[in-house]
Amino acid sequence: YADLAERYAADSDYEPGTVVVFGGEKEITVTANRADYRVAGVISTEPAYLMSSTSEGLPVALRGKVPVKVVGKVCKGDLLITSDTPGFAEALIASAAFGSPHSVFAKSLVDDDGYHPRNIWAVIL
């Protein structure tokens, strides 16, 4: 893995690949809204670099290559935004109104036309 992560206090214990936003009762919480501009990152699996390593909390990938939970079809190079499915991302569809440009947080590294919830490799921007 090749990501840069930092620990943040979370309001629950989230598994790696979960998309999180700033908010909730602690510093971060699971995303549940499409194109949420509060996106913080993705819960990291094994960060290459971990900031605030002595702090409690979950490692949130801020940059680099990580597995990300997604729903819907994605193509290599697609921009990813938060989805309405809690903790998951989806591909940004260019023709769809999506709110803030600040809601884009990653790019897909794979072509995957599955529609079931799953993990894919992506680069956090």
Located regions from the model:
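Extracellular receptor-binding modules and their adjoining Ser/Thr/Gly/Asp/Asn-rich linkers
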Residues: 1-125
